[in-house]
Amino acid sequence: MLWVDKYRPKSLDKVIVHEDIAQKLKKLVSEQDCPHLLFYGPSGSGKKTLIMALLKQIYGASAEKVKVENRAWKVDAGSRTIDLELTTLSSTNHVELTPSDAGFQDRYIVQEIIKEMAKNRPIDTKGKKGYKVLVLNEVDKLSREAQHSLRRTMEKYSSSCRLILCCNSSSKVTEAIKSRCLNVRINAPSQEEIVKVLEFVAKKESLQLPQGFAARIAEKSNRSLRRAILSLETCRVQNYPFTGNQVISPMDWEEYVAEIATDMMKEQSPKKLFQVRGKVYELLVNCIPPEVILKRLLHELLKKLDSELKLEVCHWAAYYEHRMRLGQKAIFHIEAFVAKFMSIYKNFLISTFG
């Protein structure tokens, strides 16, 4: 088992990071009925850990007895029937799913499937809360239609169902949904908090950490606790005992994006654009989110660019990220940004060096 799963806090009392939020959640569910909740914050900040600990606080050990199912449904959509398939993670009292996995059909997931689950109260309550919890991941990636359907579902089945929504950015969630939830902002942990967790993991694994080693891992983690723990485990596999100057390797996909940035700086041509497109597609196939690719690519380019170009390149990166949110095929928008950058950079080189 990966350390990131092995040492994930199982209850609100054992949470190391965000202790204040954990105690407020504990008080909330013990004193009154839990409202709909919206957890939002950067990836790796600990949203999912808090949600799972909260479920255990509400339902006890039964919340940990989960099973993974690939479920299929037939949904009537006017004159035709749509076949939907989605992976769910469920226990007696809660169901977890990611409706945005259904793509443009996400509104049918929200309309029909959540409705079906919300109608059924948990049978085996044993004196616990008489409602079922639906955990919806990546709510910020739902289409507008799906979010409107979700709002109606929240109102209609609030007596038998509570929704816990999870997303990276609340700005992409409609005000109608946000106003019906208690919004819980989960900030990225500080470097000091990450160091504290790494030292806790190292102690549990009986590892000796050199002076400043945990701080170096925390610094390279970009304030992602998940990434920091994975990096520590990777370093343990690569070389132990640790050394003070041990290299903390970047992730493979980050090195690959750095190569793409170097290619874009070296040559600006249709041939190179085609090669870059292939590399970007390879990253997408390996499940690297398109917005993460674009953000990392911009980061690598800014390290190499002249200061007078940085503002314009940032503008176009933001423009194509926005276009990517509105469209369906992410590869088109990343490729468009690459082409735009090549055009800007080539014109800059011509005007500077002739």
UniProtKB/Swiss-Prot annotation:
Q: Which GO terms describe its molecular function?
A: ATP binding; ATP hydrolysis activity; DNA binding
Which Gene3D superfamilies does the entry mention? Answer: 1.10.8.60, 1.20.272.10, P-loop containing nucleotide triphosphate hydrolases
Coarsely, its chief localization is: nucleus
Tell me the Pfam families matching this sequence.
DNA_pol3_delta2, RCF1-5-like_lid, RFC_C
Q: Biological process GO annotation list? A: DNA replication
Q: Does the keyword Nucleotide-binding apply?
A: yes
Q: Does the keyword ATP-binding apply?
A: yes
Q: One Gene Ontology cellular component annotation? A: nucleus
Entry keyword set: ATP-binding, DNA replication, DNA-binding, Nucleotide-binding, Nucleus
- Determine the domain of life of the protein's source: Eukaryota
Database matches in CDD domains:
AAA, HLD_clamp_RFC
Binding-site list for ATP: 41-48
Localisation per UniProt entry: Nucleus
Which InterPro entries has this protein been placed in?
AAA+_ATPase, DNA_pol3_clamp-load_cplx_C, DNA_Rep/Repair_Clamp_Loader, P-loop_NTPase, RFC_lid
Q: How does it assemble?
A: Heterotetramer of subunits RFC2, RFC3, RFC4 and RFC5 that can form a complex with RFC1.
Would you identify the family this protein belongs to, as annotated?
Belongs to the activator 1 small subunits family.
Please describe what this protein does.
May be involved in DNA replication and thus regulate cell proliferation.
Family matches, as PANTHER family:
REPLICATION FACTOR C / DNA POLYMERASE III GAMMA-TAU SUBUNIT, REPLICATION FACTOR C SUBUNIT 3
The identity of this protein, by name, is Replication factor C subunit 3
The gene behind this protein is RFC3
